[in-house]
Design a protein with these regions (language model features):
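Substrate-binding/catalytic cleft of secreted carbohydrate-active enzymes
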Residues: 1-126, 131
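Surface beta-strand/loop "capping" patches
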Residues: 126-145
């Protein structure tokens, strides 16, 4: 293992027994901004990362500003990772039209299936931007890395 790379383990949030040896950062999924801020106000020893946040399924990416505002106020807040970045789908030839189309989930008549649950990115599977990307671009563009 490369000792120079930070280690991330989201499970430390659920079990603090090994937090000093198992993870170099505090990490949670989908923590509301208020919970993130409570951690950051309490003299944290480790930076905070949202390993998943802003799940973009349907029209659900709203609320990004609340998280981005924390970047301006807390140095130990490192931001987060949007789930998902790109839809997960496959190009297949449509049996009726003969055209290449994107299919996912229940499109293959497989069971069990989460149907469109793999279609939750800020880009379509063909890398075409979705409207939610406009909000991400707007707020991310206001912050330096």
């Amino acid at each position: 293992m490369d000792p120079g790379r930070p280690v991330h383990y989201e499970g430390v949030f659920q079990n603090r027994a090994y937090e000093d040896s198992i993870s170099d950062m505090e990490s949670q999924m989908y923590a509301p901004p208020e919970r993130v801020e409570a951690y950051l106000r309490d003299n944290p020893r480790k930076p905070f990362i949202l390993c998943e946040y802003m799940h973009d399924m349907g029209n659900s990416l709203g609320g990004l500003k609340s998280y981005m505002d924390l970047l301006d106020r807390y140095e130990m807040y490192q931001g987060g990772y949007i789930w998902d970045f790109i839809d997960q789908a496959l190009f297949v030839r449509d049996e009726v039209t003969g055209r290449e189309v994107l299919r996912y989930g229940g499109d293959f008549d497989d069971r069990p299936s989460d149907y469109e649950f793999s279609g939750n990115g800020i880009l379509f599977a063909d890398r075409t931007p979705k409207p939610a990307l406009q909000e991400v671009r707007y707020y991310y563009g206001q912050h330096e890395t």
